[in-house]
Amino acid sequence: QNPNRFIGLM
């Protein structure tokens, strides 16, 4: 999974 996906939740 991409770390960018976590930023999307923010």
Curated annotation (Swiss-Prot):
Family designation: Belongs to the tachykinin family.
Matches recorded under InterPro entries: Tachy_Neuro_lke_CS (IPR013055)
One annotated GO biological process: defense response
Residues carrying Methionine amide: 10
Keyword set, alphabetical order: Amidation, Amphibian defense peptide, Neuropeptide, Pyrrolidone carboxylic acid, Secreted
GO CC terms, sorted: extracellular region
Tissue: Expressed by the skin glands.
Lineage: Eukaryota, Metazoa, Chordata, Craniata, Vertebrata
Statement: the UniProt record of this protein carries the keyword Secreted: yes
Protein name: Phyllomedusin
Biological role: Tachykinins are active peptides which excite neurons, evoke behavioral responses, are potent vasodilators and secretagogues, and contract (directly or indirectly) many smooth muscles.
PROSITE patterns referenced in this protein's UniProt entry, alphabetically: TACHYKININ (PS00267)
Localization in the cell: Secreted
Residues recorded as bearing Pyrrolidone carboxylic acid in the entry: 1
